[in-house]
Every structure is written in C-alpha cells, then in structure tokens.
Amino acid sequence: MRILNVSLLVLASSLVAFVECGRDFYKILGVAKNANANQIKKAYRKLAKELHPDRNQDDEMANEKFQDLSSAYEVLSDKEKRAMYDRHGEEGVAKMGGGGGGGHDPFSSFFGDFFGGGGGHGGEEGTPKGADVTIDLFVTLEEVYNGHFVEIKRKKAVYKQTSGTRQCNCRHEMRTEQMGQGRFQMFQVKVCDECPNVKLVQENKVLEVEVEVGADNGHQQIFHGEGEPHIEGDPGDLKFKIRIQKHPRFERKGDDLYTNVTISLQDALNGFEMEIQHLDGHIVKVQRDKVTWPGARLRKKDEGMPSLEDNNKKGMLVVTFDVEFPKTELSDEQKAQIIEILQQNTVKPKAYNGL
C-alpha cells in the first residue's frame, strides 16, 4: 500500500511539473538553455521567415506554429521573463502579467522587412506617403560572416492629434456658373475637407537592425513606416544600407574570400604547414609539400563567405602566396651550393608587360 501511495505521489508531481512547464520555448526556437541574446534573435529571425503564415498558406497549423514561435521569443528575449520561465515555466510568466500570448507578431518593426522587398507598404493605393530615409550602416566583415544585431537609437518625427481643426485632403474641382441666357462659365475651385488638427512631435525610438549572415554591400534592411511622416498620409520607409568596411586580412569577392600570406624562401622551396585564423575564430590549416612560387594560389572549399540565400553554402577561401627573399648577401660557397642543389639552367632575362 505504501508503494502504491509513493507511486501516485510521483505521478502527481510529474503532472504538476508538466502543467507548470507548459511549452518548451527553448525547443521551439531550437536553441540551448544557455543561449545568449544574439543567438536567440538569430534563431527567431530564421524560423520566422520559414514559419510565417504568408509563406505557409497550405499549412493549417501555420498560425499556431507562428504564435508559439512569437511567444517563445517574447519570453526568452526579456531577461525578467526568461528568468521567471526558467524557474517556474510558462505558468510563472503568465502570473507576471504578460508574455507568452503569441496572438500576433509584435516584432515586425524590430526586424524590418521579412521578405526583402522594399515596396508597397504605404497603405491603400492613392494614399500619400512621406519620403523614404536611407542610412548607410557601416559593419565589419566579421559581423557579416557571423551575423550581428545593431541597436539604433533615433528621434522620429510623428504627427499627433491636437486641439482644433484644419483643412485637409484638398483637391481642385471644376464648377459651372450660368452667366446669362445660354451662357456658362467653367472655373476651377479648391475644395478641402475638415480634419482634426495635428502637431509634429519628436519621439524616441529604438530599432534593432539585423546584419544578416552573407549580406553584401548595398543590401538593405527596410523598416516600413519608420521614414518621414506625411500630414495627410502614411510615413515613408527607413532603409539601412549595408556598407562593409575594409578588412586588414581578407577581401570579399561575391561569396569568395581572398587573403595573402607571406612565406620565407626556405618554406617556399621545402614546403610548410601554417594556420590562418578565420573570421569566426576557427583555424584553417594550410599545408604545402611542393615548391611554392610567388603568386601561387591555394583554394580551400567551403571556407569562404556564407551565401545570403542559404547560409549552409559557402564560397572558397583563396590564399595567394608571396615569397620573402633573404636580405643577407650569400658567400661564393653558398652560391655554388645553391647552383649544385637546384641544377637550374640560366634563364636569359626577358622584359615583358605582366599587367
């Protein structure tokens, strides 16, 4: 009987723990429990693109999956909610009075334009729209290789309703006036509606711009409705244009990376082993057991930049070798030894255009 009571107690405790835990937000986002804020943001961004209902219209569960994803991010991206979730699960977060609902996507302005467009979000056709604002965002090659988030603090001009009324939606209409028997005159008049009065105020705004893995110069992140306001329409868009700063060791061409390495004449003749530290810190080993001439190139597959379209695909790393010759003068005996070793015929100097 005692064993039965213990078993029932264990079962009841398991059920209580299951109820308290609710959804596994770490599993939904596909991140470890010790994931940092940047890893959580990157995971959400990636899955939000894949699971967005607009891209999965044939999936009846699309809305539910996206709501779960939004709930997971809403909780795990907030330090206090995440700490509560880690201790008491989803039920503990609910008792805080917020988070975990997932009834909508609260992060559209956080991420800008999910689908890389740039048009269209100015409201109904014919609605006037404020000017777009384009800002150059200077980033490092490391940030493009690994992915990064940049916090932008700005003051945004917005129109707020105030007391009084104003003329709005003004347009020109043609009117006809009878001047006498059989005589008419047409003229143009300005006609306006009456709208609530507005005033222009400055609001503090914080945006987080994602530097996407594999993004190239000129790639844009678009935040719809964050541009210049329009007194009778919708605000324009805010566009961040990626500008990659020059790197001291690597040069990017498409998805390929290029770097130059200087080796000694001794290594050029005998072969060598060396290591190159990549943009994320991992080590690329380079080995040669043959003669390496100045300008020789070695290509390492899948060690270039990740593709923007598919981060699992990478270009090549192209290593160009420069050979440093010794600056000390050789003795006659050393020169004779080199001639003996190389057994190389004398090449007559020949001038040519090598460009």
UniProtKB/Swiss-Prot annotation:
PROSITE patterns: DNAJ_1, DNAJ_2
TM spans (from-to): none
Domain J: start-end pairs: 24-89
Keyword Chloroplast: no
Alphabetical keyword list: Chaperone, Signal
Stored SUPFAM superfamilies: Chaperone J-domain, HSP40/DnaJ peptide-binding domain
GO molecular-function terms, A-Z: misfolded protein binding; unfolded protein binding
Pfam families associated with the record: DnaJ, DnaJ_C
Entry-linked InterPro entries: DnaJ-B11-like, DnaJ_C, DnaJ_domain, DnaJ_domain_CS, HSP40/DnaJ_pept-bd, J_dom_sf
Swiss-Prot/TrEMBL GO biological process terms: protein folding; protein maturation
Signal peptide: 1-21
CC annotations in GO: endoplasmic reticulum
Source organism superkingdom: Eukaryota
Record protein name field: DnaJ homolog dnj-20
The organism's taxonomic lineage, starting at the top: Eukaryota, Metazoa, Ecdysozoa, Nematoda, Chromadorea
